[in-house]
């Protein structure tokens, strides 16, 4: 092989190696930032990965909110009306957080089936429901619950 061809081959191999390395790093970074949404039924059925950051959403069960008296620890149960999952959170809950309303919790699932959340998102107003929660409730056979101040037929629009 003459020196010119050898030099071109080395340059092409170096460029391909650099592109491959950059692509690997980019895909690795994207994989770390993907938070897949899981319903309480999917989590209870073992479809959600342990130790991986996920988004869990549903309706907060009435009477399930437990606050610690000496810390910011909070536990509550989220349901899709088929199955339920416990959410453990340390921090201040959003002002709009209420029992009986839809939330999305971001965190990791532990071996006991509890989602240890580092972020809790509450719906914005009485008509809003996170799209994932609304879809999950429809798929589970439950209509999107109507707020107390709205007639049921208006809530499904």
Swiss-Prot record:
Q: According to the UniProt topology, which residue ranges lie Periplasmic?
A: 30-157
Gene3D superfamilies assigned to the protein according to its UniProt record, in alphabetical order: Nucleic acid-binding proteins (2.40.50.140)
Residue ranges, Cytoplasmic side: 1-8
Q: What SUPFAM superfamilies is this protein classified in?
A: Heme chaperone CcmE (SSF82093)
Binding-site positions, heme: 124, 128
Q: Name one Pfam family in it.
A: CcmE
The cellular location(s) given in this protein's UniProt record come to:
Cell inner membrane
InterPro entries for this protein: CcmE, CcmE-like_sf, NA-bd_OB-fold
One GO MF term: heme binding
**Which coarse location class describes where this protein primarily resides?**
membrane
Q: What does this protein do?
A: Heme chaperone required for the biogenesis of c-type cytochromes. Transiently binds heme delivered by CcmC and transfers the heme to apo-cytochromes in a process facilitated by CcmF and CcmH.
Protein's name in the database = Cytochrome c-type biogenesis protein CcmE
């Amino acid at each position: 092989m003459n020196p010119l061809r050898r030099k071109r081959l080395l340059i092409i191999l170096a460029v391909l190696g650099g592109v491959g390395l950059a692509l690997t790093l980019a895909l690795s970074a994207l994989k770390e930032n993907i938070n897949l949404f899981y319903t309480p039924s999917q989590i209870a059925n073992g479809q959600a990965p342990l130790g991986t950051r996920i988004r869990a959403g549903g309706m907060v069960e009435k009477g399930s909110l437990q606050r610690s008296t000496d810390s910011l620890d909070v536990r509550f149960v989220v349901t899709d009306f088929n199955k339920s999952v416990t959410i453990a959170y340390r921090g201040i809950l959003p002002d709009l957080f209420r029992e009986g309303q839809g939330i999305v919790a971001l965190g990791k699932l532990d071996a006991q089936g509890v989602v240890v959340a580092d972020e809790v998102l509450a719906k914005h107003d009485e008509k809003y429901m996170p799209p994932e929660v609304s879809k999950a409730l429809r798929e589970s056979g439950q209509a999107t619950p109507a707020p107390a101040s709205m007639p049921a037929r208006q809530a499904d629009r």
